[in-house]
Amino acid sequence: MTKRYWNINLEEMMEAGVHFGHGTRKWNPRMAPYISAKRKGIHITNLTRTARFLSEACDLLFDAASGGKHFLIVGTKKKAADSVASAAIRARCHYVNKKWLGGMSTNWSTTETRLQNFRDLRAEQKAGKIDRLPKRDAAMLKRQLSTLQTYLGGIKYMTGLPDIVIIVDQQEDYTALRECVILGIPTICLIDTNSDPDLADISIPANDDAIASIRLILNKLVFAICEGRSSYIRNR
């Protein structure tokens, strides 16, 4: 994996509050190597470690994107949902930002069936077929379509399991992380001071509660993907 420069600035991370962890009573002792201090009852993350692992993650994503790999970004925490969607769309990644349906990856055949149903309903709506149905039937299909859009809208173009999964909040999306571990899908995960740093392939110590922090980390990661995709297109 080639090391590159990703303009990861400690001052910028401080301004975004990346270094603020959880209260000292609510922490995982395994995070001790990633904590630099305690301040006013909260743990402070060592941003030098954050920069190191963020850089490693960017290198991995660049190399994967350069090889034409596919990515999934998972962040179902309400406050992060919009940032996850916009970052994923910018980098042409799949995303889940509402709810991780249990078995979404480990029971991929069921997910494929749901996705095909979703695509069929979208095609019928686009062709105006749903509106020509009796009102009751049309209303039922529209509700079904709305539900599918909410939970599967970000993965509607997925045709197989992703090559790498980025997870915004380990605690919130633990099920997604465990499914990736079971399937051997490489993971990049933001970890706050209450997380387990040993679960993901690359764990990035960072504040997973502040929008500014989440957005900054995601921006770096998707920039690396975009750069990798550009390299892939140039070298094809």
Swiss-Prot record:
Keyword Protein biosynthesis listed: no
Gene3D superfamilies: Glucose-6-phosphate isomerase like protein, domain 1, Helix hairpin bin
GO MF term list: structural constituent of ribosome
Biological processes annotated in GO: translation
Domain of life: Eukaryota
Classification via InterPro entries: Ribosomal_uS2 (IPR001865), Ribosomal_uS2_bac/mit/plastid (IPR005706), Ribosomal_uS2_CS (IPR018130), Ribosomal_uS2_flav_dom_sf (IPR023591)
Keyword Metal-binding: no
PROSITE patterns assigned to the protein according to its UniProt record, in alphabetical order: RIBOSOMAL_S2_1, RIBOSOMAL_S2_2
Pfam short name (any one): Ribosomal_S2
Annotated localization: Plastid, Chloroplast
GO CC list: chloroplast; mitochondrial small ribosomal subunit
CDD domains found in the cross-reference section: RPS2
Entry-linked SUPFAM superfamilies: Ribosomal protein S2
Major localization listed first in the record, in broad terms: plastid
Keywords per UniProt: Chloroplast, Plastid, Ribonucleoprotein, Ribosomal protein
Protein family (similarity comment): Belongs to the universal ribosomal protein uS2 family.
Protein name: Small ribosomal subunit protein uS2c
Native source organism of the sequence: Acorus calamus var. americanus (American sweet flag)
Lineage of source species: Eukaryota, Viridiplantae, Streptophyta, Embryophyta, Tracheophyta
